[in-house]
């Protein structure tokens, strides 16, 4: 039998799972570990698809890229989940988070160095999560990211930490980045616990074994992935086009202008923005598939989204086949670039559904705004995108070739039912003064520096607050895959109308429905009130659901049970539809009245 051929030597060793020879070949440093075979797979992607755990372990030890996607847009971790192997998923997930952490170590000093050249400033980024579904819109939160920049130092304050276990995670945190000659200092300040976690990021990774061990996922996390569909959501902006919005009627239509945060802005629509969601279920048991379908069908039928189901229908399974090579593809066939596999493939046969929905993103661009998107704002978004999935989506959008001007406001889709609206405001405290920021006198050196909006930032905002405990970075918070959790939460909330879960919606209303532009109470007081409100509601819900003992006082007979989810949804949609029709009728009536007035005014002259 012939040995490995001269082409794709690492891939051929992976195919045969000859992991000891693979280890030796990698130690020689003579082969490209990221080389793609004729089917577009790297050695790691091939090893995962074939389920060759020993080869996967060797490649990961040699730092094969876990974050790479194949030609179909699936990441290595998603392919690992499709194998259904818990050990494979645990290993790939651990190294994925480890590689993200090391990239963070290398990237932060470079981003801070970029910021050093830019003028100092303070700005607020207001994030509002909105929805066109009436019931979902009630639970959408909002948050204001407050950003201070001075030299190589950056501070970002937030109270909306993320989304986990079907709830929005809140807490008062500050993220402080301070550039240094040999790297950077990162501080995460937890104002609720008065604790500061400090991490020094050098140009070289310290104690990689310790960091790798800290990234090991729990068994519950692995089990959750293996019993849930694989979901991929991304914005397809390949055909995006920007158009000026118009206002007015008939021959008086003009390009739309709006004032945002005190700046005149041109309003653009980004068309042909497609939100693509693909779901794979080949790794699920029949019970898990039934549970998944039962949770999604009413909502999907309500949205009316175009959905396509596809499954592998390749050649019949042959006697010599294995579960990861069901059509018995030979290595000679696989590695021959001129041989067509047609519908045959390696790996478990794919069961996938896909949804495509077109959206319009909206931008408000001001050519008068003094901030620079590339020099001042993009590095900050890059920093926050390391640990925040929403900032990562914003970064992907603003890196497009935008029309001229600074985006003072952006509205982009995050999921099929959720949009994010980001507004930049209070530049250098011009709207609401802050003690930590001031505009220098005209005679000062800062004012004479040529900066179109000179600003001085108090250096003490980048220091550890008095009385706080300082700890090392004992824990890690890798970038969360929030998309699927958020989508499922939106589905759950969209089906609610009455009962205890409706009171949970009231919690979010109480937490987030603040009047824009109003001066808020002190942040600590507001947050404490939020916690007390949530605790009180949780206790009341528990009391309402606890079983009653024999000696308990009689309770008022319960009202008839609430209708089914489908019935709730139908009623909610009917109400929403009637309201929408009424709004359209009023708008049409106003338009007709205006046209009659204009016609009369023209005939009189």
From Swiss-Prot:
Regions of compositional bias (Pro residues) in chain numbering: 550-563
Any one Gene Ontology molecular-function term assigned to this protein's record: ubiquitin-modified protein reader activity
Chain positions with Phosphoserine modification: 552
GO biological process per UniProt: negative regulation of receptor internalization
Region of interest (Disordered), residue spans: 306-333, 541-605
Record InterPro entries: ANKRD13 (IPR021832), ANKRD13_C (IPR055285), Ankyrin_rpt (IPR002110), Ankyrin_rpt-contain_sf (IPR036770), UIM_dom (IPR003903)
Residues recorded with modification Phosphothreonine: 556
PROSITE patterns per UniProt: ANK_REP_REGION, ANK_REPEAT, UIM
Keyword flag Magnesium: no
Membrane is among the record's keywords: yes
GO CC field: cytoplasm; late endosome; perinuclear region of cytoplasm; plasma membrane
Biased composition (Basic and acidic residues): 576-589
Function as written in the Swiss-Prot or TrEMBL entry: Ubiquitin-binding protein that specifically recognizes and binds 'Lys-63'-linked ubiquitin. Does not bind 'Lys-48'-linked ubiquitin. Positively regulates the internalization of ligand-activated EGFR by binding to the Ub moiety of ubiquitinated EGFR at the cell membrane.
This protein's name: Ankyrin repeat domain-containing protein 13D
Organism: Homo sapiens (Human)
Lineage, broadest ranks: Eukaryota, Metazoa, Chordata, Craniata, Vertebrata
């Amino acid at each position: 039998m012939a040995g490995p051929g001269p082409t794709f030597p690492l891939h051929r060793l992976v195919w045969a799972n000859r992991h000891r020879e693979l280890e030796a070949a990698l130690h020689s440093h003579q082969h490209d570990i990221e080389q793609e075979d004729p089917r577009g797979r790297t050695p790691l992607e091939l090893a995962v698809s074939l389920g060759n755990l020993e080869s996967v372990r060797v490649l990961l030890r040699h730092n094969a890229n876990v974050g790479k996607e194949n030609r179909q847009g699936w990441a290595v971790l998603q392919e690992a989940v499709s194998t259904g192997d818990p050990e494979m998923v645990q290993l790939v997930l651990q190294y994925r988070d480890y590689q993200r952490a090391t990239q963070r170590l290398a990237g932060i000093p470079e981003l801070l160095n970029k910021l050093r050249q830019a003028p100092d400033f303070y700005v607020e980024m207001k994030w509002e999560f909105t929805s066109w579904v009436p019931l979902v819109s009630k639970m959408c939160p909002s948050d204001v990211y407050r950003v201070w920049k001075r030299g190589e130092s950056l501070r970002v304050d937030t109270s909306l930490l993320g989304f986990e276990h079907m709830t929005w995670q809140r807490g008062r945190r500050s993220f402080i980045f301070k550039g240094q000659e040999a790297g950077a200092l990162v501080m995460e300040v937890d104002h609720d616990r008065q604790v500061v976690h400090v991490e020094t990021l050098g140009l070289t990774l310290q104690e990689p074994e310790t960091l790798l061990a800290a990234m090991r996922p729990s068994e519950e996390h692995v089990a959750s992935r293996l019993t849930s569909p694989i979901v991929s959501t991304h914005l397809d902006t390949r055909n995006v086009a920007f158009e000026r919005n118009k206002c007015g009627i008939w021959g008086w239509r003009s390009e739309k202008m709006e004032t945002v945060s005190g700046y005149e802005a041109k309003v653009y629509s980004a068309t042909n923005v497609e939100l693509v969601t693909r779901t794979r279920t080949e790794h699920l048991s029949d019970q898990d598939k039934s549970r998944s379908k039962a949770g999604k069908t009413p909502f999907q039928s309500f949205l009316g989204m175009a959905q396509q189901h596809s499954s592998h229908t390749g050649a019949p399974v042959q006697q010599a086949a294995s579960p990861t090579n069901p059509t018995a593809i030979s290595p000679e066939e696989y590695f021959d670039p001129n041989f067509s596999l047609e519908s045959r493939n390696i790996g478990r046969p794919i069961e996938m559904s896909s949804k495509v929905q077109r959206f319009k993103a909206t931008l408000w661009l001001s050519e008068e705004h003094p901030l620079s998107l590339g020099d001042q704002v993009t590095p900050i978004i890059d920093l926050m995108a390391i640990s925040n999935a929403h900032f990562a989506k914003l970064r992907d959008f603003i890196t497009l070739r935008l029309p001229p001007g600074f985006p003072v406001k952006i509205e982009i889709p995050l999921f099929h039912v959720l949009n994010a609206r980001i507004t930049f405001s209070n530049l250098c405290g011009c709207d609401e003064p802050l003690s930590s920021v001031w505009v220098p006198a005209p005679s000062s050196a800062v004012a004479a520096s040529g900066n179109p909006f000179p600003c001085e930032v108090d250096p003490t905002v980048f220091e550890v607050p008095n009385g706080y405990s300082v700890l090392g970075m004992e824990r890690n918070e890798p970038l969360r895959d929030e998309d699927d959790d958020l989508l499922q939460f939106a589905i759950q909330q969209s089906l609610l109308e009455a009962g205890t879960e409706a009171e949970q919606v009231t919690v979010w209303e109480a937490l987030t429905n603040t009047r824009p532009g109003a001066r808020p109470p002190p942040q600590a007081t507001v947050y404490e009130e939020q916690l007390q409100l949530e605790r009180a509601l949780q206790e009341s819900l528990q009391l309402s659901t606890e079983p009653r003992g024999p000696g308990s006082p009689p309770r008022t007979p319960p009202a008839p049970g609430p209708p089914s989810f489908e019935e709730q949804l139908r009623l909610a949609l009917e109400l929403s539809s009637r309201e929408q029709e009424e709004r359209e009728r009023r708008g049409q009536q106003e338009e007709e009245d205006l046209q009659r007035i204009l016609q009369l005014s023209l005939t009189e002259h």
